[in-house]
Amino acid sequence: MGKKKGKGAVGLIALVCEETGIRNYTTTKNRRNTQEKLELMKYCPSLRKHTLHKEGKIK
């Protein structure tokens, strides 16, 4: 038996670079505790500097 694929409390999200639009990182987020979108300063390998990464959908 497999797991159900529904909208649970913890979801998998992608972090998208604001300058390039590339999905560089994936992480999990508890949707009940943090309802707003994540915004983190992360390293972008294509630009070779730290840029703002925002939460996006995983395709």
Curated annotation (Swiss-Prot):
Looking up HAMAP family in the UniProt record yields: Ribosomal_bL33
Q: Name one GO molecular function term.
A: structural constituent of ribosome
Q: Give a yes or no for keyword Ribonucleoprotein in this entry.
A: yes
Gene Ontology CC annotation, any one: ribosome
**Name the record gives this protein:** Large ribosomal subunit protein bL33
What keywords appear on the UniProt entry?
A: Ribonucleoprotein, Ribosomal protein
Q: Indicate whether Manganese appears among the record's keywords.
A: no
Entry's InterPro entries? Ribosomal_bL33 (IPR001705), Ribosomal_bL33_CS (IPR018264), Ribosomal_bL33_sf (IPR038584), Ribosomal_zn-bd (IPR011332)
